[in-house]
Design a protein with these regions (language model features):
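Generic beta-strand/beta-sheet core signal
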Residues: 10-13, 52-57, 149-154, 158-162, ...
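Short, well-ordered loop/turn elements at secondary-structure boundaries
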Residues: 2-6, 44-47, 105, 142-145, ...
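Short amphipathic alpha-helical segments
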Residues: 64-68, 121-128, 183-187
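Short, solvent-exposed secondary-structure capping/transition elements
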Residues: 60, 118-119, 169
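Internal maturation/activation junctions in enzymes
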Residues: 80-90, 105, 110-153
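Function-dense linear segments that define catalytic or interfacial modules
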Residues: 4-113, 179-183
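Short glycine/threonine-rich loop-to-helix capping motif typified by GTGT followed
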Residues: 99, 161-164
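Catalytic or ion-translocation cores adjacent to nucleophile or general acid/base/metal-coordination motifs
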Residues: 164-188
Length: 188
C-alpha cells in the first residue's frame, strides 16, 4: 500500500455522509450499500452505475468545458430515464437518478495550466453540473440526482482518446507497465 496506493481503502460512513468532502455532510447517500467494480460510484443494492467522461485538455476555455459538461450531463441524466428489466433497479434509479460526470487528463491539465486553474475548473464544473441538474430535473418533472460527479480512474477509454487516465500522468520514458487482461482462448 505504501508503494503504490493499492489496495485502495474506502469508508462507507464517509460515502454515506458526503457528496464532496469539500462540502458539509448532507447524508444524501445514506442507503449506499457498496460501489461499482472500480469504486468510482457508490451504489445501493440493485442500482446501475451511470458514468460519463470528459477530457479537460480538449478545451481552451472554461466556457467551452462547461458546454461539454452540459452535453455529458444530459447524456448521463437521459440514461437514468430508461427502464431496465428489473423492477427493483427501476425503483432505485427513479429515486436516485445517480450519475457520475468525471474528468480525465487531470494531472496533465494541472501540469499545463497549474493547480489553481484546475481547482477553479473543478469547482466551476461542479457548480455548473448542479445548476443543470436543478433546472433539467425540474423541467423533466423528475428528482434531482443524488450524486452528479465522480472521480473515475478511466484507464483504457481515456488512452484511446489520447488522454492520461483519470488523475494519473501520461506514461513517460521508453518503458512503462500496464496491466492487460484477456481470455486464455484469445488468439493474442
Amino acid at each position: 500500500m505504501a508503494l503504490n496506493g493499492e489496495p485502495g481503502v474506502i469508508w462507507m460512513d464517509v460515502t454515506r455522509k458526503y457528496g464532496r468532502l469539500k462540502d458539509p455532510a448532507n447524508n444524501k447517500d445514506w442507503r449506499a450499500a457498496g460501489y461499482n467494480p472500480c469504486a468510482e460510484q457508490s451504489l445501493e443494492s440493485f442500482e446501475c452505475c451511470t458514468l460519463v467522461e470528459t477530457y479537460l485538455n480538449r478545451h481552451d476555455s472554461l466556457e467551452d468545458y462547461k458546454r461539454t459538461l452540459k452535453f455529458a450531463y444530459l447524456y448521463a441524466k437521459t440514461v437514468t430515464l430508461l427502464p431496465t428489466h428489473w423492477e427493483d433497479t427501476n425503483a432505485i434509479m427513479q429515486r436516485n437518478r445517480r450519475i457520475g460526470t468525471s474528468m480525465s487528463g487531470v494531472a496533465n491539465f494541472a501540469d499545463r495550466v497549474g493547480w489553481s486553474v484546475l481547482r477553479d475548473w473543478m469547482d466551476e464544473g461542479y457548480t455548473t453540473i448542479q445548476q443543470y441538474d436543478k433546472g433539467y430535473s425540474e423541467w423533466l418533472g423528475i428528482r434531482e440526482s443524488i450524486k452528479t460527479t465522480t472521480v473515475k480512474p478511466s484507464g483504457t477509454v481515456s488512452i484511446l482518446a489520447g488522454e492520461s487516465p483519470g488523475v494519473h500522468w501520461t506514461p513517460g520514458g521508453e518503458y512503462f507497465l500496464r496491466a492487460i487482461r484477456f481470455s486464455n482462448e484469445d488468439p493474442m
